[in-house]
A protein has these predicted regions:
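Short alpha-helical transmembrane segments in multi-pass integral membrane proteins
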Residues: 1-38, 94-159, 202-241
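Transmembrane alpha-helix boundary and packing residues in multipass membrane permease domains
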Residues: 40, 44, 52, 56, ...
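Short runs within selected transmembrane alpha-helices of multi-pass transporters and secretion channels
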Residues: 1-3, 84-87, 156-175, 181-193, ...
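Hydrophobic faces of transmembrane alpha-helices in multi-pass small-molecule transporters and flippases
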Residues: 1-4, 22-53, 78, 82, ...
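Membrane-helix interface segments
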Residues: 64-65, 179-180, 208-209
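Small-residue-rich hydrophobic transmembrane alpha-helices
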Residues: 68-132, 163-186
């Protein structure tokens, strides 16, 4: 479907139009791609390192704890999908607003998407809190694993509140071209804060798998603070790509 769409003559990106008008890529466009994309590339690499370190520590807690942890990660991914969808909306609307020279409208779009995300987060918190046991019983019959999962869910309800909002704000910043800041913020939060807090609570303080999830919560709070502060400063609307 994606390939077919770019062969339509009336699309914004149209292969027939490009070929008929002999449009060729320029070196300046290539430099812009590198300028915007290099920070995102390193951000993703370093974030994956942070995720891997967290997974290693979770696996070290034992098979039962790891099983409960993995289900918790899948449940958290569900809430991420809501934030990711609103992030895509914010990126498109903010990009269009900034392109039209209307930074105030871009900020309003960001705030509106964040409010919608906060409402969804509150709804998910209720579902996760009251349905924690039921959700884990869909995966496990062993009550001791379900008990571990319920404890994890009690941390996830706090994670969700910060997660959805930070994903939206990070998307707003990326849509404006502030990719270097988001890369630095994500690297500090995921690779450093998540790893250190997980080790501190999971091993040093002896909370086990719940301590690993405290690291996940610390990561989300840090990213939320970084993204919110940057968004409210408003400097991102002045970035030229």
């Amino acid at each position: 479907m994606s390939i077919a769409s770019i062969f339509k003559k009336d699309n914004f990106i149209s292969i027939p139009y490009i070929m008929s008008h002999k449009i060729k890529p320029t070196f300046a466009a290539f430099l812009n791609l590198i300028k915007v994309g290099y920070s995102v590339f390193f951000e993703q690499v370093l974030m994956r390192i942070g995720f891997m370190l967290t997974a290693i520590m979770a696996a070290d807690q034992g098979t039962d704890a790891m099983a409960a942890h993995q289900v918790g990660m899948n449940i958290m991914a569900l809430s991420f999908s809501f934030g990711d969808g609103l992030q895509s909306t914010a990126v498109a609307l903010i990009g269009r607003s900034l392109g039209a020279g209307d930074p105030d409208l871009a900020k309003e779009y960001g705030r509106t998407c964040r409010l919608i995300g906060a409402f969804i987060a509150v709804c998910l918190v209720g579902i996760y809190y009251f349905g924690a046991s039921g959700l884990y019983h869909l995966f496990f019959r062993e009550e001791h694993i379900v008990a571990i999962g319920v404890s994890i869910m009690h941390v996830i309800i706090f994670v969700v509140i910060f997660q959805i909002c930070q994903v939206i704000y990070m998307g707003c910043l990326r849509g404006a071209g502030d990719t270097l800041y988001t890369a630095i913020a994500s690297t500090i939060s995921v690779t450093i804060i998540r790893t250190v807090v997980s080790y501190l609570f999971g091993y040093t303080l002896g909370f086990g798998i719940i301590g690993i999830w405290m690291g996940v919560l610390g990561d989300q709070i840090a990213r939320f603070i970084f993204a919110t502060v940057r968004f409210k400063q408003g400097k991102w609307v002045q970035i030229k790509i």
